[in-house]
Regions:
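Walker A/P-loop NTP-binding motif
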Residues: 35-36, 55-68, 85-89
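Walker A/P-loop
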Residues: 40-58
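Signature of the SF2 helicase/ATPase Hel1-core->accessory helical subdomain module
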Residues: 64, 80, 85-88, 168-169, ...
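Conserved helicase motor "Helicase C" RecA-like lobe of SF1/SF2 P-loop NTPases
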Residues: 476-500
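A substrate-engagement module of RecA-like helicase motors
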Residues: 2-17, 67-197, 202-205, 256, ...
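Conserved RecA-like P-loop NTPase helicase motor core
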Residues: 441-451, 501-606
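A contiguous, basic/glycine-rich beta-loop/short-helix subdomain that forms a polymer-engagement track
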Residues: 162-197, 208-217, 321-444, 451-458, ...
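Conserved pre-motif I regulatory segment
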Residues: 2-46
């Protein structure tokens, strides 16, 4: 095959499609490495920092190669960007008739069967839901793909979606009467026929878990090459899919679906209603037994509580009775057969959870206002991923802007079971020394001090003023975010956007539109967000992002590492925090023309021995501890923006 390098350096291909396009050496180096991995069937990890052009560096060799390729992303937004923007451009530049397809998880597609099943039911409790059903029904008649992302007038969390999309629990598969017009099945068929399929990590690991279960099922086509973008997310996503989850919402949906399906059979509806009522009561009592507060906690914290265990056993017994009732009805219809299967699976899952004795797993739960979610999560996924890799003798390419810690890949290699992977680290071509200033403020108390957030927020007011708003203020806890929000409401005049008061997409759209806003966010705003230009000129990080000691999975991993002779702080907590800080800091400079200020306020950065690892992991920006330097820097940028000559003092900022 013709080399990717020769195509990327051919200006007649890309320059007409990308104004100002010039091949970059880091991009070419990555393309060479990806091409070698594809040819050899090897495993390659590439850390490609912002600005290296990694998307073209893997898409070009992937499209030039023979055989099908899967490209997996961490987020649906990147998935859509690759399919609708990047791939059409690369295909046009290469002039290759490659077939490409987009495949998402089943919850992203309309289910015609469930739409018809629920459309005429009078169990929609609110006017909002009725109106949403009408919108969906109208759209269903004209959509080609059935991808619910098309219907932008409904939010992602609209209450109608569970009624008109399927889950692995309730999908009837080939037995569904709507199988021929099923958008999900049509998307899978297109994927089977494509040369390159864009998926996401959740779908990839759902498929891997199915294949590993020995069930003889698969969601994705086989591939010669798998490319993971945003690969730093793989360990946590893999852990979720190689574990087990059961929620009271799933159990309640089983009851509702059983009742809907039973209307088309000769089932004893009175008895079924009684059994479903018992299950509903069991779900409610189980939720109440865990206390009013919403929380995440290890099961070991409550498994000796008699009331909790009794409520769990009562729910299990109610589920067993429903399972026994549904068993004979499975022959009545495909829908009832699916409900019967789900009931048996829920019984097995809840029984195993209440037993809670599987080794190398952490059993934990989450409580929400009306729901309990039970989780059984593996402490490590390295063995499963190693087995997955060995079962599939194809090329694996893993890339992200943040894979290494201190320039070394051992941490991510060990977590993924890919110790022998080849590695390549490519630094950003941006001139951070000229584009950005790093500010570590003086005089703050230790982060454990109750006054820390208040004093930090007060110190950041003049920084925000100097930046003219245009700030991401990133927090490691919701409590600190709420405290800072209350202070800033009375201290700044810029638009204040606070996570939790609107959806993530709405907040980001508003931030871009206003041009001088201050956005306060926690973990979901630390990565996967790309705000270029003048709307974002300052990123403030309140603390070094060590994982919460109250997180049950992290706590169990820490205990496991220490119990087996390791050093959990050095081997797990510190590397994870470094990678998280690099992600947060990466929100600032997204473009060669971007400029701005990065604030890492945590005094441990300079007072603790491990602080150097954090500092050295960040881009080499101009560093200061003085507020007046920060103010001169922003004054300098403002004059530049208006075409004025900066003062001598500002030029020295």
């Amino acid at each position: 095959m013709t080399s990717a390098r020769s195509h990327l350096t051919d200006l007649t291909r890309f320059a007409p499609l990308l104004p100002g396009y010039q091949p970059r050496e880091p991009q070419l180096e990555m393309a060479d490495a990806v091409e070698t991995a594809i040819r050899s069937g090897g495993t390659l990890m590439v850390e490609a920092e912002t600005g290296t052009g990694k998307t073209l560096a893997y898409l070009v060799p992937a499209l030039l190669s023979e055989g099908p390729t899967l490209v997996s992303t961490g987020t649906k937004s990147l998935q859509d960007q690759l399919f609708f923007k990047d791939l059409p451009l690369v295909r046009k530049a290469l002039g290759l008739p490659r077939k490409v397809a987009l495949l998402k998880g089943r919850a992203n597609y309309l289910c015609p069967y469930r739409l018809e099943l629920h459309q005429e039911e009078a169990r929609f409790l609110t006017r909002e839901t009725v109106e949403q059903m009408q919108i969906v029904a109208h759209w269903a008649g004209r959509t080609r793909t059935g991808d619910i992302a098309e219907l932008q007038q409904l939010p992602e969390d609209a209450p109608i979606w569970p009624w008109v999309t399927s889950t692995a629990d309730n999908c009837l598969g080939t037995d569904c009467p709507s199988y021929q017009e099923c958008p999900l099945m049509n998307a899978r068929k297109e994927a089977q026929e494509a040369d390159l399929v864009v998926v996401n990590h959740h779908l990839f690991f759902a498929d891997a878990a199915l294949r590993g279960s020995g069930a003889g099922m698969e969601l994705l086509p086989s591939a010669n090459t798998v490319i993971f973008d945003e690969a730093h997310q793989l360990p946590e996503i893999a852990a979720a899919f190689f574990g087990d989850t059961l929620s009271t919402r799933q159990v309640q949906e089983l009851g509702r679906d059983s009742l809907s399906e039973a209307g088309q059979t000769t089932a004893d509806l009175a008895t079924l209603n009684q059994l479903i009522a018992s299950v509903e009561k069991g779900c409610l009592d189980f939720r109440l037994s865990l206390g009013e507060m919403e929380r995440r906690a290890p099961w070991s914290e409550v498994c000796d509580n008699e009331a909790v265990m009794r409520a769990g056993e009562d729910l299990l017994e109610a589920l067993r009775q429903l399972d026994v009732f549904l068993g004979p009805l499975g022959k009545a219809s495909r829908g009832m057969e699916a409900c019967s299967r789900r009931a048996s699976e829920h019984v097995d899952c809840l029984a195993a959870y209440l037993q809670g004795d599987q080794p190398n797993r952490v059993y934990w739960f989450e409580t929400f206002k009306r729901t309990v979610v039970l989780h059984s999560t593996p402490l490590s996924v390295s063995a499963q991923l190693r087995a997955q890799r060995e079962r599939n003798p194809c090329s694996w390419v893993l890339t992200s802007a943040t894979l290494s810690v201190g320039g070394r890949f051992e941490h991510i290699q060990k977590r993924l079971g890919l110790d022998s992977a080849d590695t390549l680290r490519l630094e950003s071509p941006f001139d951070f020394k000229k584009q950005a200033v790093f500010y570590a403020p003086e005089g703050l108390p230790q982060p454990s001090d109750p006054a820390y957030t208040r004093e930090l927020t007060e110190q950041m007011v003049p920084v925000i003023e100097a930046a003219g708003g245009r700030t991401f203020f990133l927090f490691t806890s919701h409590r600190a975010l709420r405290e800072a929000a209350e202070i800033l409401r009375t201290r700044i005049t810029y638009p204040l956007l606070v996570q939790g008061e609107s959806g993530r997409r709405e907040l980001l759209d508003s931030f871009r539109d206003k041009g001088n806003a201050v956005l306060l966010g926690t973990s979901s705003f630390w990565e996967g967000i790309d705000v270029r230009g003048d709307a974002l000129s300052c990123v403030i990080i309140d603390k070094l992002p060590f994982g919460s000691p109250g997180d049950p999975v992290a706590a169990a991993r820490i205990e496991h590492i220490n119990r087996n002779g390791g050093n959990a702080f050095r081997d797990y907590q510190l590397p994870q925090a470094v990678l998280a800080l690099r992600q947060g800091a990466g929100r600032l400079i997204r473009d060669p023309q971007d400029t701005g200020l990065l604030v890492v306020a945590d005094p441990r950065l300079l007072t603790k021995s491990y602080g150097k690892l954090f500092v050295n992991s960040l881009p080499n920006m101009t560093k200061t501890r003085k507020l007046d330097v920060v103010q001169r820097f922003f004054a300098y940028l403002a004059r530049q923006l208006h075409g004025e000559k900066p003062t001598e003092k500002e030029g020295q900022a």
